[in-house]
Amino acid sequence: MPELPEVEVTRLSFAGRIAGARIEAVSMGKPLRWPLGCSPQQLVGLRVLAVRRRGKYLLVDLSDGLLLIHLGMSGSVSFGSSLSSPGKHDHFDMVTSLGTLRLNDPRRFGAVVYAGDEHDAVAHKLLGRLGVEPLSDAFDAALFHQALKPRQTPIKQVLLGGEAVVGVGNIYASEALFLAGIRPTTKASRISKPRAALLHRAIRQVLTQAVTKGGSTLRDFSNAQGEAGHFQLDAMVYDRAGMPCKVCGSPIKSIRQGQRSTFYCVSCQKP
């Protein structure tokens, strides 16, 4: 599943090129996870003002309303003036005066949803419970520790939940916990203030590095220009089960948490 870095990398790869474009046509393929919420014709004539990100959502600000785009499990966005005809897995095409924005989603867990504004009922349902942005100034170490204190579930699952901090995802949760020296099975409520500060710093560091590296391409992720990411080549623990830890040499262990694979070093990461 594309995580925060992949969504941010996608945004950066087309936001500047689509700003100011006039929407000329919209076509839909097979139904996605949620309906568009308006007639495609209603979007024609509107202008694209900007593209933002909230958690794992792309927010395309229009001259009237906005589009919320979620990439689901396997989705990707492309943008260009010479895209081929829509294929089997291309389910949303927005033709503009500056190029076509396309959502390709083989598994159709993604979505494109229209909302009147960021605070209406549709947008609130999707965005209302999202936690603080980890790369923003609002992500404060002390407040992060306070958010962890009442939670009795393992810290890895708290990070994936998106309410204490948004968008970290499976890959980067494993990597940040390794960097902070915290075992993923540790209850969030047991993490001390100093260790929470280490994790806070590690989350920011890992996500920043991932954006710089273009995200992670494990199967088929690419940005809106068709470029793959390379963070996975630098992973310390993710997808390295049985391989030696790059720090201490101990074998990396893999377990299942909440139906997701977790990777960690028994020696470097303490309960």
UniProtKB/Swiss-Prot annotation:
Q: Which domain of life is it from?
A: Bacteria
Q: Which Pfam families match?
A: Fapy_DNA_glyco (PF01149), H2TH (PF06831), zf-FPG_IleRS (PF06827)
Q: Where are the zinc fingers (FPG-type)?
A: 236-270
Cofactor note from UniProt? Answer: Binds 1 zinc ion per subunit.
Q: Catalytic activity, per the record? A: Hydrolysis of DNA containing ring-opened 7-methylguanine residues, releasing 2,6-diamino-4-hydroxy-5-(N-methyl)formamidopyrimidine; 2'-deoxyribonucleotide-(2'-deoxyribose 5'-phosphate)-2'-deoxyribonucleotide-DNA = a 3'-end 2'-deoxyribonucleotide-(2,3-dehydro-2,3-deoxyribose 5'-phosphate)-DNA + a 5'-end 5'-phospho-2'-deoxyribonucleoside-DNA + H(+)
What keywords were assigned to this record?
Answer: DNA damage, DNA repair, DNA-binding, Glycosidase, Hydrolase, Lyase, Metal-binding, Multifunctional enzyme, Zinc, Zinc-finger
Residues annotated as binding DNA: 89, 107, 151
* Gene3D superfamilies assigned: 1.10.8.50, MutM-like, N-terminal
- UniProt-listed Enzyme Commission number(s): 3.2.2.23, 4.2.99.18
- The record's active-site residues are 2 (schiff-base intermediate with dna), 3 (proton donor), 56 (proton donor), 260 (proton donor)
Recorded GO MF terms: 8-oxo-7,8-dihydroguanine DNA N-glycosylase activity; class I DNA-(apurinic or apyrimidinic site) endonuclease activity; damaged DNA binding; zinc ion binding
Cofactor(s), by name:
Zn(2+)
- InterPro entries, alphabetized: DNA_glyclase/AP_lyase_DNA-bd, DNA_glyclase_Znf_dom_DNA_BS, Formamido-pyr_DNA_Glyclase, FPG_cat, MutM-like_N-ter, Ribosomal_uS13-like_H2TH, Znf_DNA_glyclase/AP_lyase, Znf_FPG/IleRS
Name a single GO biological process: base-excision repair
- Subunit structure and binding partners: Monomer.
Family classification? Belongs to the FPG family.
**What this chain does, per the record?**
Involved in base excision repair of DNA damaged by oxidation or by mutagenic agents. Acts as a DNA glycosylase that recognizes and removes damaged bases. Has a preference for oxidized purines, such as 7,8-dihydro-8-oxoguanine (8-oxoG). Has AP (apurinic/apyrimidinic) lyase activity and introduces nicks in the DNA strand. Cleaves the DNA backbone by beta-delta elimination to generate a single-strand break at the site of the removed base with both 3'- and 5'-phosphates.
In Swiss-Prot or TrEMBL terms, this protein is called: Formamidopyrimidine-DNA glycosylase
* Annotated source species: Polaromonas sp. (strain JS666 / ATCC BAA-500)
- Provide the taxonomic classification: Bacteria, Pseudomonadati, Pseudomonadota, Betaproteobacteria, Burkholderiales
